[in-house]
């Protein structure tokens, strides 16, 4: 058993604060802020005593395509100037950038408008029919020459920001607050002015990796977390990314520090990786899983802790138990009085699972309506709850100890990649 010291709470919290700080500007992949975060993490691994495991010391290059605003977004309908992220937001996965000026045209389910009535117009869809297909709707609008598409998208406190982009996008596509969409829909012909300086670029980024050698060089446990976030908006709106995922990075870093202090070699290698490009489409983990620095036997990914005052539930990255690692992790989680939520998809664990590597994707599953929303300005140190971080750390430590003390678990491994 590894004698894990009680985590250094002050150091752990300072790591989270630094990663969330204005100096890092939201850690958007490929930006100065993300490079500062990577430098901090590599220096932390060096100081902890982990050996470099990247192509260039602690770094491995990753090309990340992503959608990013290069200037403030503006939308004016009639005399009303709308507020970005509160009244409207871009659908980055489907949207191009651009400047559009023109009359508003309302389209409802069952309307039969000619191409001439739509070409060059800015279309608002104020109600979504039950069989609404977003992708085909956007495709049809672009084919008909619609200048921009405004789609009612509920009444959130804040619209979620995304940076997942596509070079196939042809027109600006905007989420619009439902109450605004319904109000303007009754006044077709209103003048609309949209400025969306959204660009899809491929930027050079980096994964950060450190290594602790073990006795059995044929077995390697990967502990990982993504360090990128969404980046602050050009208009100054901050996206600190405290829960997503400064929390996970800080826990994995603290576990790595304490593993490096052990007095004896572990029975297996430990590889620690801080991954980039998660928010843009899992680019860092996809590259890592396709070309790891050594064969991987098992992977533990940590993404998001601190939504609520207590850690009531952890998602595990799978819809059902299917291999030895998920069964082991489920047992450890339950022993800490935490519910296991069998949910899959959306985090870096996906890239490793797709390669057939036993992998769990741990992350707090919010259980309360008032839980902090990630991908909004509310994901900040002021809204972070520390007890889930403490328990998440304890669960990861216990999981590592189970692997140290129970070699028979490793004998169940399906495959080394």
Each predicted region: which residue ranges?
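Second-shell loop/turn segments in exported
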Residues: 1-5, 23-32, 61, 104-106, ...
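N-terminal capping segment at the start of a domain
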Residues: 5-32, 48, 52-57, 61, ...
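Catalytic-core environment of secreted peptidases
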Residues: 8-24, 29, 40-52, 122-128, ...
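Noncatalytic luminal/extracellular "stalk/propeptide" segments of secretory-pathway proteins
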Residues: 14, 21-119
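Soluble metallo-hydrolase cores and metallopeptidase-like ectodomains found primarily
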Residues: 82, 87-115, 163-241, 257, ...
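A conserved hydrophobic secondary-structure block that centers on an alpha-helix together
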Residues: 112-153
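His/Asp/Glu-rich mid-to-C-terminal helical/loop segments that flank catalytic regions of hydrolases
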Residues: 257, 369-417
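Metal-dependent peptidase/peptidase-like ectodomains
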Residues: 275-372
């Amino acid at each position: 058993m590894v004698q894990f010291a009680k985590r250094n709470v002050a150091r752990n919290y300072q790591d989270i604060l630094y990663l969330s700080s204005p100096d890092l500007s939201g850690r958007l992949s490929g930006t100065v802020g993300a490079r500062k975060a990577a430098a901090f993490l590599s220096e932390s691994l060096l100081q902890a005593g982990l050996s470099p495991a990247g192509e260039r010391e602690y770094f491995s290059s990753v090309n990340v395509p992503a959608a990013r605003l290069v200037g403030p977004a503006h939308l004016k309908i009639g005399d009303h100037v709308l507020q970005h992220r509160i009244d409207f937001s871009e659908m980055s996965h489907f949207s191009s950038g651009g400047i559009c000026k023109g009359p508003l045209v309302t389209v409802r389910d069952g309307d039969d408008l000619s191409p001439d009535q739509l070409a060059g117009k800015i279309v608002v869809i104020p109600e979504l029919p039950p069989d609404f297909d977003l992708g085909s709707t956007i495709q049809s609008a672009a084919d008909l020459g619609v200048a921009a598409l405004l789609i009612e998208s509920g009444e959130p406190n804040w619209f979620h920001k995304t940076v997942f982009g596509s070079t196939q996008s042809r027109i600006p596509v905007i989420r619009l607050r439902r109450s605004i969409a319904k109000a303007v829909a009754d006044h077709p012909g209103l003048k609309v002015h949209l400025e969306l300086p959204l660009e899809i670029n491929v930027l050079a980024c980096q994964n950060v990796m450190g290594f602790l050698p073990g006795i059995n060089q044929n077995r390697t446990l990967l502990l990982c977390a993504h360090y990128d976030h969404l980046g602050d908006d050009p208009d100054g709106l901050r996206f600190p990314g405290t829960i997503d995922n400064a929390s996970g990075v800080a826990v994995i870093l603290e576990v790595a520090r304490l593993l490096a202090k052990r007095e004896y070699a572990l029975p297996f290698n430990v590889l620690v990786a801080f991954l980039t490009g998660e928010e843009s489409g899992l680019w860092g983990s996809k590259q890592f899983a396709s070309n790891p620095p050594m064969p991987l036997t098992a992977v533990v990914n940590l993404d998001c802790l601190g939504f609520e005052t207590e850690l009531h539930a952890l998602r595990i990255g799978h819809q059902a138990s299917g291999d030895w690692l998920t069964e082991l992790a489920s047992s450890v989680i339950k022993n800490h009085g935490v519910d296991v939520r069998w949910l899959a998809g959306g985090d870096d664990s996906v890239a490793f699972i797709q390669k057939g590597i036993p992998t769990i994707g741990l992350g707090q599953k919010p259980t309360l309506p008032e839980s902090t929303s990630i991908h909004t300005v509310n994901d900040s140190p002021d809204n972070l709850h520390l007890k889930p971080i403490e328990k998440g750390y304890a669960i990861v430590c216990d999981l590592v100890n189970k692997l140290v003390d129970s070699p028979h678990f490793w004998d169940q491994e399906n495959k080394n990649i």
